[in-house]
Design a protein with these regions (language model features):
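Long, low-complexity, polar and repeat-rich extracellular regions
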Residues: 1-225
Length: 225
């Protein structure tokens, strides 16, 4: 499905049921929302996508030149895959409920927000925010879940909470003015925060990194350079 809707506030809702999608497993759903030259206060998109069942695949691209677009994605089942790309000023809520679900998120430019929830085992989330003023927050409940966050440019914030065993959380932030927090409750968890800083520039604020761990056999690494 694709389309241009100049002058309209779009609110599509998409639901994927496992059996019907599994019958065309080789096909990847591509859903794109594009915007014409409508007034700025009307260029707002709201989309809700649900994957239910097993082995579903989703590719979603949301592009807008104005802030305020919102997307909600829910993966409920086993071995679902979602690939999501957003422009600037977007908000995304992601829920992974089940096992072996996989989500790749790319948010560009400025002031993007992501809130995520992982519930189950062996789920994977990869986030790439390429801009400034981005905010990422969320939690994982279960075992062997992984969250990998990469924030570039400046003044981004990320907060991850994991409850369970053998989980992995990684936050990498480039440039200056970042904040990163990882909280892990359980055993054999691994946390890593890496923050960069512009060389020969004393006018920029350095990053702030915090790791909290409770349990046994955990590993924590903070690199600021």
């Amino acid at each position: 499905m694709s389309g241009d809707y100049p002058g309209l506030a779009n609110s599509p809702e998409l639901t994927l049921i496992g059996e019907s999608v599994r019958a065309a497993r080789s096909r990847v759903l591509y859903y794109r929302m594009a915007f014409g030259y409508a007034p700025a206060d009307q260029r707002v998109a709201v989309a809700e996508i649900t994957q239910r069942g097993d082995n579903n695949s989703l590719s979603f691209s949301q592009q807008t030149y104005y802030e305020g677009s919102r997307l909600s994605v829910s993966q409920d089942g086993v071995s679902n895959q979602a690939e999501i790309a957003q422009g600037d000023g977007n908000r995304l809520a992601l829920v992974q409920d089940g096992n072996y679900n996989d989500a790749d998120i790319r948010q560009g430019d400025y002031h993007n927000e992501l809130n995520f929830t992982q519930s189950g085992d062996d789920n994977r989330l990869t986030v790439d925010q390429n801009g400034y003023g981005g905010v990422i927050s969320g939690s994982s409940t279960g075992n062997r879940n992984s969250v990998d966050i990469d924030q570039r440019f400046a003044s981004n914030r990320a907060s991850v909470t994991q409850n369970g065993d053998d989980n992995l959380a990684s936050i990498e932030q480039g440039n200056w003015g970042h904040q990163a927090t990882i909280t892990q409750l359980g055993s054999a968890n691994e946390a890593m925060i890496r923050q960069g800083f512009p060389a020969n520039d004393n006018t920029r604020l350095p990053g702030v990194a915090t790791i909290h761990q409770s349990g046994t056999g955990n590993s924590a690494t903070i690199i600021q350079q």
